[in-house]
Amino acid sequence: MCHGGTWAGDYVLNVIATGLSLKARGKRRRQRWVDDGRVLALGESRRSSAISVADVVASLTRDVADFPVPGVEFKDLTPLFADRRGLAAVTEALADRASGADLVAGVDARGFLVAAAVATRLEVGVLAVRKGGKLPRPVLSEEYYRAYGAATLEILAEGIEVAGRRVVIIDDVLATGGTIGATRRLLERGGANVAGAAVVVELAGLSGRAALAPLPVHSLSRL
């Protein structure tokens, strides 16, 4: 009887140990390491395998010539957002730069992807800054100019209180600064305190940062 009891106890302990081991293994597979702008491949040493977030962004960005109009080289971040480690690294890095925000503003359309992820990470809300005609009225509207023509951005004038809130603008790419500049003006018209902007990619040759000065601008990769 004593022997049988010992065997049963050992069996239960083995089952528990196996379950804990599998759980820990699953947890390790889900981990994303981001530290001071560095990303680690899973299962590799922090000391030997760290690569920069900028390198991750560059490796998963697709250059598309003459899109959406001839003469424009489009930076397609779709592969980056579809990669689980890439998205996790970008989210963590942008969240670090948006720390302290009461609200993040995501710019239509790709800015929505990263803004929502960052807002979730920071446990704050996300405000959708939409292209003209996409929101029910009343709205605040702002026209601006980009590399391939005029455009309009809008936010709701009712239903969302932005006055007095510290807001960080999140977008995928900073080019001439027209989109983020229009977003800033919209938010300030609503009474928000725009603390800065954070983007995944900055096209340094187009002087968007200078156009937005003195607004603090953070980018994960400068191309």
UniProtKB/Swiss-Prot annotation:
Taxonomic superkingdom: Bacteria
Pathway it works in: Purine metabolism; AMP biosynthesis via salvage pathway; AMP from adenine: step 1/1
Pfam families, alphabetized: Pribosyltran
GO molecular function terms attached to this record: adenine binding; adenine phosphoribosyltransferase activity; AMP binding
SUPFAM superfamilies found in the cross-reference section: PRTase-like
Reactions that this protein is recorded to catalyse: AMP + diphosphate = 5-phospho-alpha-D-ribose 1-diphosphate + adenine
Enzyme Commission number(s): 2.4.2.7
Subcellular location: Cytoplasm
GO annotation terms (biological process): adenine salvage; AMP salvage; purine ribonucleoside salvage
A GO cellular component annotation in the UniProt record: cytoplasm
InterPro entries in alphabetical order: Ade_phspho_trans, PRibTrfase_dom, PRTase-like, UPRTase/APRTase
PROSITE patterns (alphabetical): PUR_PYR_PR_TRANSFER
CDD domains reported for this sequence: PRTases_typeI
Keywords (A to Z) from UniProt: Cytoplasm, Glycosyltransferase, Purine salvage, Transferase
Main location: cytoplasm
Oligomer and partners: Homodimer.
PANTHER family: ADENINE PHOSPHORIBOSYLTRANSFERASE
Functional note: Catalyzes a salvage reaction resulting in the formation of AMP, that is energically less costly than de novo synthesis.
Similarity field: Belongs to the purine/pyrimidine phosphoribosyltransferase family.
Designated name of the protein: Adenine phosphoribosyltransferase
Organism (species): Mycobacterium tuberculosis (strain ATCC 25177 / H37Ra)
Gene name per UniProt: apt
